[in-house]
């Protein structure tokens, strides 16, 4: 897996997953850890998507944390990707290409997590995430732009972050 093809935020999400595994005394990086990483580093992206889908982000984080706490603890050894986590990353690469992106974004990772069967997918689906609506929210978030740089996520919704819409005010 070439992480140079991931955006900086996606790389940070994977790094957060690794740190979470280590801090919890676990060894296997599961899709749940990847989802936790995406939620932690991609707040702007996930908050926008969750709001559009009518999801409670805090509830998702709570259920996810309980699920991660229930995973087996192992002392010693380096963290490694489970088959499910590896499948998530492979699918994220595929989804990125399908979206016309040059880099794997947090949105592609979220799409992949949703579509790889397992606990992380179930958590998202139980909270109300549906692929068609997720894709629609991603399109709205991106406003027709593709991920063409490693820092593309920082440009999403930049106008709404720093300006006031006088029509809405």
Report residues per predicted region.
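Histone-fold recognition with a strong bias for associated Lys/Arg-rich disordered tails
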Residues: 1-169
């Amino acid at each position: 897996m070439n992480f140079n093809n991931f955006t900086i935020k996606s790389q940070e999400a994977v790094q957060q997953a690794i740190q979470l595994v280590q801090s919890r005394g676990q060894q296997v990086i599961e899709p749940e850890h990847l989802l936790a990483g995406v939620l932690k580093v991609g707040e702007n992206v996930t908050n926008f998507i969750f709001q559009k889908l009518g999801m409670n982000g805090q509830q998702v984080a709570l259920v996810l944390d309980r699920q991660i706490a229930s995973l087996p603890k192992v002392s010693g050894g380096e963290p490694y990707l489970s088959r499910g986590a590896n499948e998530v990353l492979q699918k994220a690469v595929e989804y990125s290409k399908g979206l016309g992106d040059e880099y794997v974004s947090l949105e592609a990772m979220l799409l992949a997590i949703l579509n790889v069967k397992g606990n992380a997918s179930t958590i998202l689906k139980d909270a109300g995430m549906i692929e068609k609506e997720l894709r629609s929210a991603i399109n709205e978030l991106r406003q027709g732009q593709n991920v063409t740089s490693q820092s593309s996520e920082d440009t999403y919704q930049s106008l709404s972050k720093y300006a006031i819409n006088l029509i809405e005010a």
